[in-house]
From Swiss-Prot:
Protein's recorded name: UBX domain-containing protein 7 homolog
Gene (UniProt): ubxd7
Molecular functions (GO terms): ubiquitin binding
Species name: Dictyostelium discoideum
Coiled-coil intervals, chain numbering: none
Pfam families named in the record: Thioredoxin_7, UBA_4, UBX
CDD domains with a match to the protein in the record: UAS (cd02958), UBA_TAP-C_like (cd14273), UBX (cd01767)
InterPro entries from the UniProt entry: Thioredoxin-like_sf, UAS, UBA-like_sf, Ubiquitin-like_domsf, UBX_7/2, UBX_dom, UBX_domain-protein, UIM_dom
Amino acid sequence: MEDPDILSNFLSITGCDDSSLATTILENNNWDVERSVDFFFTMNDPSNVKPTTSSKKTSSPPTASSSSASSEFDYNEDEFRDPIPQKMDKLVDHYYQPTQRSYQKQTNVFEAFRDFEKERGINQDKATEKQKSLSELFKPPLDILTFGTFDEIKKMAEQKKYFVLVNIQDVQEFDCQKLNRDTWSNKDLKELIGENFVFWQVNSANPEGKWFTQIYPVFKFPYIAIIDPRTGQKLQDMTGFIDAEEMAQYLVTFLSTNSFSGQIDPPPSSSSSGASKKQKKYNTEDEELELAIALSLKQEQERNSKSGSTSPLSQQQQQQQQQNNNNNNNNNSNNNNSTSTTTTTSTTTTKILGTNNKKDEKEDEDDVEEKDEDFEDDDEIEEDNYDDNYYYGETVQKEISEEEQKKVEIKQLVEKIQVTSKIGTEGDCIIQVRCPGGETLKGQFHSHDQIKNIYYYVQVKTGISNFKLFTSFPKLDLSGELMSKTLKELDLAPRAVLNMLQE
């Protein structure tokens, strides 16, 4: 409804002469004088009015249609945009390598007319026999290598369900050349790698090698790592030179604790059939020595038992001959008594012979059973119980020589040693201890194990309590406060050789 007071107030404030325009503005602003006045002066701002050629400053009043359009524009100014549509995409693409990896140096314009195949043949002809032999001696293991980019290698390993064995080499390091000459050339190691790994060897100066050393930080060459092709995770790594035997043992221990399918084959059970039983493989020289001592003691006891069984029989025969001689010197009246005594002695000797033969047969059967048990048992050498005294009407004491006595003492010392813990049998570090007698102990420890664990292992294996351990070069005495240090703190991981000095 029109309010004449509000209209007249608006006209007096604004100085507008058109009452219809004022009514329209008031209606659009709900008859609010302040808002209507602001709207009027905003519309008639002199800065928005274009200058005219006339000398008089006149402004044509806006029409009702223009005012209504502008007001509608103000009310519909707040518009909302459409929502962003959903889409599926990869956070990191499979081929995430930078473009620099595929960059190749531009060839010279003069090299376009060169025949590289012909030049290669000329250079090979000029090479001496020594150069050819050296190149063949230090050449990489091409028969087990897999060529391609790291992504291609991972795809191939994932299809074969193998782990990736990576070897990063540096031409300036001689240990890398030794690795090709001594380690990768081993036939047994080649078979192990070819059946369980995809082997990838690359130079550190190669673009692929540079990219690998950036993703997996490498500070020393040669560098060996085992990669899971599914996730790209580095499972294990090592640096420096390693011989073929230690490398094979390193890979076998890795395969025994890791499986591509996640299921590790359990060790063979002891309840398997007799045909499938195999002799235990002794890894250390001490275990082989213990087995040899036990077998030698068995053989000597068998010989002594046989010699002991003949001695009482000879005594019985001597007694029989003496009795026969005495009977011959007697009168004819005592002939009946002599014949009776001879028959009784003969029957006793036959009984003794029968019992001795039965005992020998039982002992042979026991020896066969104990040998089978030695092959089955993995941790202990069973005790052989043989009776040194046999009863043949009288007790015969077996005399033991000095050498046999020493062997018995060694056996008793070995039997007293019982390893109640797993120290020296598991871990990621291989520690070798050279004993004064020329023997070498080899044990597996963890990098966080202390030096006193090695002392305990050596004491259990050798039975010696007063000794010291020290490194070769630089010479370091591992005693005192250093016994509480770990292998990692003393830089003895993942492998080290220690010397033993008996006090």
